[in-house]
Amino acid sequence: MKLVVGLGNPGPEYAATRHNIGFLVAQKFAQQMGVSLKRQAYQGIVGTGRADGQETMVLLPQTYMNRSGVSVVSACKSKGIAVEDVVVIHDEIDLPFGSIRIKVGGGHGGHNGLRSIVDLLGCRDFLRVRMGVGRPQGQVDVAKYVLGQFSSTEKSQLDNVLENSVKALEVLLQKGAQQAMNEFNNRVFLI
């Protein structure tokens, strides 16, 4: 079984923020798989379906970003999911908005959701889909920026970015990390 985790914060006040782009991609992926994300389990919202013939669980942790690892570890232990079968989708300020970067393993890079997952899994070897949200301009606080709404320009591009992110996720699950990196890394998906 594969576990696809979209990182974000629960609640309507966070729904359309940059920090919740992981939720948005995971929700779009589940929708395209025909999976309903309504069941509460593992301190998150989950749905299970088949992606390219393999059972795949989509998880949206409801623990708030800084405790995402609690939800991920709970699902992994309950379902016997190996670390290499975990894919985490998250916002990345070090990439421009519209870019996607597939990565195998690595540190948390200051991202508290990743920090929680790495700390509680005791391992950093899971797959990541890093979603570029860009850096704040001027003296804007990073936390305020990622917890802020997308700009009107970003909103106009968001559907295209999400569609390409789902394509990247599908290639990652079907053909592996190297193929997904070759096809999607170092590209910006803006119209």
Swiss-Prot record:
Major localisation: cytoplasm
| Site-annotated residues for Discriminates between blocked and unblocked aminoacyl-tRNA | N9
Q: Which SUPFAM superfamilies match?
A: Peptidyl-tRNA hydrolase-like
| UniProt-annotated site: Stabilizes the basic form of H active site to accept a proton, residues | D91
* Keyword line: Cytoplasm, Hydrolase, RNA-binding, tRNA-binding
EC number per UniProt: 3.1.1.29
Task: Give any Pfam family that matches.
Answer: Pept_tRNA_hydro
One GO molecular-function entry: peptidyl-tRNA hydrolase activity
- Keyword Hydrolase assigned to the entry: answer is yes
Question: Which spans are transmembrane here?
Answer: none
tRNA-binding found in the keyword field = yes
Catalytic residues of the enzyme: H19 (proton acceptor)
- What is catalyzed by this enzyme? an N-acyl-L-alpha-aminoacyl-tRNA + H2O = an N-acyl-L-amino acid + a tRNA + H(+)
| GO CC terms, sorted | cytoplasm
Report quaternary structure and partners.
Monomer.
Q: Which family does it belong to?
A: Belongs to the PTH family.
Q: What does this protein do?
A: Hydrolyzes ribosome-free peptidyl-tRNAs (with 1 or more amino acids incorporated), which drop off the ribosome during protein synthesis, or as a result of ribosome stalling. Catalyzes the release of premature peptidyl moieties from peptidyl-tRNA molecules trapped in stalled 50S ribosomal subunits, and thus maintains levels of free tRNAs and 50S ribosomes.
This chain belongs to the protein called: Peptidyl-tRNA hydrolase
Q: Which organism is it from?
A: Syntrophotalea carbinolica (strain DSM 2380 / NBRC 103641 / GraBd1)
